[in-house]
Amino acid sequence: MDLPDVAAVQHESRQLDLASSAAELHGGLCGWLSGGGADSADWLARILADTAQVAPAQGGALDQMRQATVAQLEDRDFAFELLLTEDGAPLPARTDALFDWCRAFLGGFGLAAQQRPALSEEGEEALQDLARLAQASSDDFDTAEEDDTALAEIEEFVRVAVLLLHGDCVMGPRFRQRLN
């Protein structure tokens, strides 16, 4: 299942008077789901920690984003993708979106996983690396082609880190439960 485009998510976000970008919303959702948070229609209120937040419209871009994200995280072919910026966005906008995504991921993950989730050693390292990325900014990059390549590598690292954390907190416990 494909993610909706960034413009559609941004449009619905503005309709709900949200100050969050598409990258932040997707990052928070991914963190929530990867930390073991429930796949439910009220996910937005949960990641924003705002019980008064209205649930996204069923079938709207935010709901499609939730459904696609759940499907991608559960996909055995590792088809998970990050929703960051529109194609062709300048490097500083793409780097800021990635780092915003990481900050939101950590927030959603913390809300869902609580104090000390049971993580593998690799999961602990991945979470620490995501925290370091969340502290970065586009000022750490130039506009050179090599920085474009570096950003693509960081995006791939983040994608794999999310799948690892989802595996530790969701897939692993689910598998162990089936064995019992």
Curated annotation (Swiss-Prot):
One of its GO terms (cellular component) is cytosol. It comes from the Bacteria. Pfam families: UPF0149. Belongs to the UPF0149 family. NCBIfam families: PRK04758.1. HAMAP family: UPF0149. This is UPF0149 protein XCC3260. It comes from Xanthomonas campestris pv. campestris (strain ATCC 33913 / DSM 3586 / NCPPB 528 / LMG 568 / P 25).
